[in-house]
């Protein structure tokens, strides 16, 4: 494992370097120098996470070899909490209570289990304070203040499922201390990654408070924001967090189960819409903070809702955008073709290079993206985003950033194409991609 990760680090160093990126981006908490890699529960597990299910995915992440390629986060999303008719049930200090019917050993034990596998543990929360905390007027840990002292009951936060979260008035004494107590609890449980969901422009004070609180714990906790964040606040998200979701959910919610759960997990329209947002947000990404395109739905073959070509294109776009690579599939039933995709260290190296690519061609279904390596080479991705008919996609080397000829290597196959003069052309099937490294001559 160490040798492979060391090789990836060398590859990333080769790609990123002087002239390859701007100054360090995002939070200066020293975390997420490269985009996070791992697995998240929402796409596949959805509303029914349990201790056993999360452990099974952690086991698979480790035993499949994905961990050896850098996929190390096991992230528990929503529905770890217990709800009643008034919203979230709370502990004695007004924080969400764990649903012990799902997690009988508690969250710390689950985090310890992940850590024992050489993995990291991620967790989930939303802004605000629970209605039940205000109704009970629970004390704020370590202070003389109570929930009613800090709640703005005239406004409710966006909480997608349990609901009934009031805004916090951060001008009130005790507000920061409440968030501090929650962050301290998460740190004591061994949380390594925290996703705060339902964030919008009105939640900047919450993001500031959580950033401050997480730092104060003394534990390194990767701080992720979700979802569909307004780009108008891009500089703020960049300053405070380690990643931010640039669009709504990748899931199509078109499965046969309740609330659209089950397979398929996504569809091509939900993936192809990411090309536009990746281009719009490109300038905000860099070491310390990344544009999050959402879960990578690779691992379960075609049943996830994408063809093999579309899955390769999805991975290619995520890698070119330097997005976090958080798998949303069932790793206990890992498809062989998909495993080969996910363990392609050339693709992972492109994602982990610290550079978000820019789009240089966008014409109908034809897209071309490029990024420059520290040694003067370029990584170039060509796409046919259409759903019918082949497309001949071309790019001039002058559009990529140089002139003359180049030695070309296909990064998906590893095969050297040879010398190509002036431009590069590929005929691509619907949803297909070509990812190359070009070494100017």
Where are each of the predicted segments found?
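C-terminal beta-strand-rich structural cap/linker in extracellular carbohydrate-active enzymes
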Residues: 419-441
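N-terminal module-boundary/linker segments of secreted carbohydrate-active enzymes
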Residues: 24-55, 60-63, 221
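Carbohydrate-binding surface patches
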Residues: 312, 318-321, 326-328, 362-402
């Amino acid at each position: 494992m160490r040798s492979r990760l060391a090789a990836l680090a060398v590859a990333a160093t080769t790609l990123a370097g002087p002239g390859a990126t701007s100054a360090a981006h995002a939070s200066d908490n020293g975390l997420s120098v490269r985009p996070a890699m791992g697995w998240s529960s929402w796409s596949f597990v959805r509303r029914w996470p349990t201790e056993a299910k999360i452990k099974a995915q952690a086991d698979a992440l480790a035993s499949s070899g994905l961990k050896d390629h850098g996929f190390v986060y096991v992230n528990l999303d929503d529905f770890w909490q217990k709800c009643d008719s008034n919203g979230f049930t709370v502990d004695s200090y007004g924080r969400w209570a764990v649903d012990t019917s799902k997690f009988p050993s508690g969250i710390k034990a689950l985090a310890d289990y992940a850590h024992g596998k050489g993995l990291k543990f991620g967790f989930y929360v939303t802004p605000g304070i629970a209605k039940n905390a205000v109704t009970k007027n629970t004390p704020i840990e370590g202070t003389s203040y109570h929930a009613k002292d800090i709640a703005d009951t005239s406004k409710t936060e966006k909480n997608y499922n349990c609901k009934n979260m009031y805004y916090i008035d951060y001008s009130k004494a005790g507000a920061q201390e409440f968030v501090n107590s929650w962050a301290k609890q998460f740190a004591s449980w061994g949380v390594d990654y925290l996703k705060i969901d339902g964030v919008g422009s009105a939640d900047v004070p919450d993001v500031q408070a959580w950033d401050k609180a997480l730092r104060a714990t003394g534990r390194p906790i990767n701080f992720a924001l979700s979802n569909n964040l307004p780009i108008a606040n891009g500089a703020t998200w960049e300053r405070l967090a380690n990643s931010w979701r640039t669009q709504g959910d990748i899931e199509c919610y078109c499965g046969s189960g309740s609330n659209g759960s089950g397979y398929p997990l996504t569809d091509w329209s939900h993936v192809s819409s990411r090309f536009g947002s990746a281009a719009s947000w490109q300038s905000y990404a860099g070491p310390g903070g990344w544009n999050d395109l959402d879960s990578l739905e690779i691992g379960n073959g075609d049943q996830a809702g994408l063809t093999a070509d579309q899955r390769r294109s999805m991975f290619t776009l995520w890698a070119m955008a330097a997005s976090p690579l958080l798998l949303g599939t069932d790793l206990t039933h890992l498809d062989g073709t998909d495993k080969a995709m996910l363990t392609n260290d050339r693709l992972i190296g492109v994602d982990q290079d610290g550079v978000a690519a820019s789009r240089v061609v966008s014409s109908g279904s034809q897209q071309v993206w490029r990024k420059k390596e520290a040694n003067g080479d370029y990584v170039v991705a060509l796409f046919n985003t259409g759903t019918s008919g082949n497309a001949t996609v071309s790019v001039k080397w002058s559009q990529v950033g140089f002139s003359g000829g180049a030695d070309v290597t296909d990064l998906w196959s590893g095969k050297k194409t040879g010398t190509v003069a002036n431009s590069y052309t590929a005929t691509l099937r619907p949803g297909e991609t070509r990812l190359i490294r070009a070494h100017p001559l």
